């Protein structure tokens, strides 16, 4: 009888351990739609969770640096399948504004992503980067690869020198007046002049977003990017 009782005890204990182990190995806890802030070095970053789908979350990294997550509202419909996590990197959008050059280091941007991941308890997730966000995604993966199921590189930017060489080639195909405005603005470091802004708009209309920008009913944020950081 003692042997039988002990066997039952061990079986019960074993079952309990298995349950605990499975609970400990569970994937990311179910995220709820909403927004909040996470404290990081230099201030707080704003984030928003779109949707409460059951599949693996998607974490979005916007471009810039100095851009915002505003355009990511176009991905809101994906929230029916999985939580879509957007946030504004420190210094722009709804996150703490700053012009502190000591904070403009890649490692600080990487730690912002890690702080958000930790705060939300993400165990597994997909990482999406756009433009500068692709470089940030790569840098983040090199330091914190655990939990990343895949990375999506959208309009990738991995090298400033290569990007500039490509841009210079494209600029030569634009009208002379546009080329002159760009050359003058960059020579004088005057990126706010009407001529330069117009030339920049022409460049992106030709080589960036060629179609009418998509809109979202959620796209109501008036938070702006940070030109100083950019």
Show the residue positions of the predicted features:
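Bacterial N-terminal signal peptides that target proteins for export
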Residues: 2-12
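C-terminal motif of bacterial Sec signal peptides marking the signal peptidase cleavage site
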Residues: 21-24
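N-terminal cap/lid segment of alpha/beta-hydrolase-fold proteins
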Residues: 28-44
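Conserved HGGG/HGGXW glycine-rich cap/lid loop of the alpha/beta-hydrolase fold
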Residues: 42-97
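Active-site loop/oxyanion-hole signature of alpha/beta-hydrolase fold enzymes
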Residues: 89-132
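Conserved hydrolase catalytic core segment
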Residues: 123-166
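Flexible "cap/lid" loop of the alpha/beta hydrolase fold
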Residues: 151-188
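Alpha/beta-hydrolase
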Residues: 183-230
């Amino acid at each position: 009888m003692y042997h039988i009782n002990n066997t039952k005890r061990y079986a019960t204990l074993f079952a309990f351990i298995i349950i605990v182990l499975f609970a400990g190995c569970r994937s990311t806890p179910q995220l709820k739609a909403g927004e909040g802030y996470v404290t990081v070095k230099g201030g707080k970053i704003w984030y928003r969770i779109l949707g409460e789908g059951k599949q693996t979350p998607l974490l979005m990294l916007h471009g810039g640096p100095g851009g915002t997550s505003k355009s990511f509202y176009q991905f809101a419909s994906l929230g029916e399948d999985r939580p879509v996590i957007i946030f504004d990197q420190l210094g722009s959008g709804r996150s703490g504004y700053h012009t502190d050059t000591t904070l403009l280091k890649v490692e600080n941007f990487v730690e912002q992503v890690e702080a958000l991941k930790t705060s939300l308890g993400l165990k597994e997730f997909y990482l999406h980067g756009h433009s500068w966000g692709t470089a940030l995604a790569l840098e983040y993966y090199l330091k914190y690869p655990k939990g990343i199921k895949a990375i999506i590189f959208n309009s990738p930017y991995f090298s400033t020198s290569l990007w500039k060489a490509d841009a210079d080639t494209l600029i030569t195909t634009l009208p002379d007046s546009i080329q002159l405005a760009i050359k003058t603005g960059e020579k004088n470091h005057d990126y706010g002049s009407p001529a330069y802004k117009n030339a920049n708009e022409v460049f992106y209309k030709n080589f960036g977003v060629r179609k009418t920008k998509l809109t979202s009913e959620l796209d109501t944020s008036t938070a702006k990017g940070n030109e100083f950081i950019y």
